[in-house]
UniProtKB/Swiss-Prot annotation:
SUPFAM superfamilies: SAP domain. Transmembrane segments: none annotated. Required during the maturation of the embryonic nervous system for maintenance of neuronal and cuticular connectivity. Essential for maintenance of dopaminergic neurons and dopamine levels. GO terms for biological process: dopamine metabolic process; dopaminergic neuron differentiation; neuron cellular homeostasis; neuron projection development; synaptic transmission, dopaminergic. Its main location: secreted. Belongs to the ARMET family. Disulfide bonds join 28-114, 31-103, 61-72, 148-151. InterPro entries: ARMET-like (IPR045333), ARMET_C (IPR019345), ARMET_N (IPR045332), EF_Hand_1_Ca_BS (IPR018247), EF_hand_dom (IPR002048), SAP_dom_sf (IPR036361). GO terms for molecular function: calcium ion binding. Keywords: Developmental protein, Disulfide bond, Secreted, Signal. This is Mesencephalic astrocyte-derived neurotrophic factor homolog. Residues 1-22 form the signal peptide.
Length: 173
């Protein structure tokens, strides 16, 4: 009876230890969010076949930008990718493995996958645009897929952002 009790305690402690070591979303935010978003875009038939998942991921990557684009590059989802560990994503996805576990496996293969971080979003409703750097103003326009033709001075960029703010501000709320 004592050995059974001791074995049960050891199993519980091992389970607790494993959950504390498990990868958290904030530790690998770009990977977890991208894998979740991609997985939710798949239909049931595609989810079951890892080859179809790989084809779908390559198609998905063509539309990605910024951090997600870099994530695709690291996995081999882009034509110009130097390496390819796409099967480390596709096979676990076909087994319905959670995004956190998939990213944990990917991190073991390539640690830089979890080095990707989203930049903090600028709250356009509360920020003073005059205090931002031109680089940040350009980034706001770039994130909106907008340009500022003929903008040379900081005031030109601010004026353009103010013009476009009503179109994009509803996304910021």
């Amino acid at each position: 009876m004592n050995t059974l009790h001791m074995l049960l305690v050891i199993c519980c402690l091992a389970g607790i230890y494993q959950t504390t070591l498990a990868l958290k979303e904030e530790d690998c935010e770009v990977c977890v969010k991208t894998v979740r978003k991609f997985a939710s875009s798949l239909d049931d038939a595609t989810k079951k076949d890892y080859k179809l998942i790989e084809v779908a991921f390559k198609k998905y990557c063509k539309t990605q930008k910024n951090k997600e684009h870099r994530f695709c590059y690291y996995l081999g989802g882009l034509e110009e990718s130097a390496t390819g560990i796409l099967n480390e994503l596709s096979k676990p996805l076909s087994w319905s493995m959670p995004a956190e576990k998939i990213c944990e496996k990917l991190k073991k293969k390539d640690a830089q996958i979890c080095d990707l971080r989203y930049e903090k979003q600028i709250d356009l409703n509360n920020v003073d645009l005059k205090k931002l750097k031109v680089r940040d103003l350009k980034k706001i326009l770039n994130d909106w897929d907008e340009s500022c033709d003929g903008c040379l001075e900081k005031s030109d960029f601010i004026k353009r952002i103010e013009e476009l703010k009503p179109k994009y501000a509803h996304n910021e709320l």
